[in-house]
Structure formats: C-alpha cells, structure tokens
Amino acid sequence: MRIGLISDVHGNLPALETVLSDMPDVDTIVCVGDVIGYNPWPAACVERVRDVASVTVQGNHDRTVRTPETYRGNQMAYAGLEYALEELSEDQLTWLDSLPRKATVGDDRFMIVHDHPEIQDRYVMPHMFSSLWSYVEEYDGLALGHTHVQHKEVDGGRVLVNPGSVGQPRDEDQRAAYAVLDTETVSVDLHRVNYDIDRVINKVEEVGLPKRVGTRLLDGS
C-alpha cells in the first residue's frame, strides 16, 4: 500500500491544493494532524481533509480550537485559533474534537501520531528521532508531525518519518512538504513543492491576521 502523508496543513488552502495535485498515485491519504491554525482557510481545509484523508489524527491546534486562550502567549497561534473558531461550523468543530490522538494504518503495522507517541505536545526534532525506536518495537514504522521539519530515518526494515508541514514549513524551505510511505517495501519518499505564497500573504492581510503569519512562509520559518 502506498500512503500519502500530509501534516500541519494549518489552514493553508493554496499549499494543500498544490500538494494534493503534486502527489503521485497513492492508495490512501493520511493526515498527521493540525488541519487548522495560523492561516486563513480553516473551514476549507477541514472540508478538503475530510474529503481526501481516510485517517486523520488530532494535532494540538485541532484539540484547542475551542479554547484559543491556551495560546494567548503566542500572538500568531492565538489569532489563528480565534479566527478558526469564528469560521468553523459546529459540525467541523465536532469533527476536530472527535479526532483520535493516535491511529494505525497499513494493517495496523504503522503508528500515526501528531507529536510524541507518549508525551502529548512534545516536539521530536530530527536529532531526537533515535529515541523513538523503543516506542515502535511492535510496528514497522511511525509517522509524526508537530515540528514542521521534514525528516526520515530507516533502520532494520523499520521507518520513522515526519512528512514536514504542508502549510507552515519551519526548516528554512518555503516549499510545502509531504511524504509517500510504501508499506510493502517499508520505505518513504520525501517531497517538496512550490505554491502561491503571495495568495496566502494577501489573504492574511485581508482577514486581519498578524502580518507575520504570511511573511514567515517566504523563508520557511
């Protein structure tokens, strides 16, 4: 089975649509969390992900959209959640509430979780990936997100992968990121694709979100 992995869409519809158009043939798509937050298309992204993804796990922004004050100390995150709460329908909010923290795919051989497998909200940066192997001893692999940094490691027929962020990369590469996992060969390909960032910047200004939400996309920070 070939699985398209998307993560950290964060309300960036132009990036999401470009990724879906660029993605090679896959059997299914899995979303590794944080459909909303930051960028100005939360409702459209929820609907698109609901339509294309067979499995979606809950990210921290998905989990806290009803309580934006959780991120009051982070202006961009707080503003994005407040905006999302206004824009999303009750049905969409209920769907985000209902998402599981973890899931399995590929005949239950691959674990999907937004952040750390056991410690909610913990960032697992590339240099920390080796610490994850003990959590996936009974699996062929693990896909996680949260850091917005694309990375993979393969060892002994098992794979760890962060597909990177569709909607807000933070690895100094402005291109939208995603990955394709092959569960038969236990291998993963990382992908990047350019999209219309100016469209996001203009929409951010139009709806009154902090300007930096848009301009940070230019340098992948």
Task: List each model region and its residues.
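Beta-strand-turn-beta hairpins that frame and shape the catalytic cleft
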Residues: M1-G4, V105-M111, D155-V159, E184-S187
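Acidic, His/Gly-rich catalytic cores of divalent-metal-dependent hydrolytic chemistry
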Residues: V154-S221
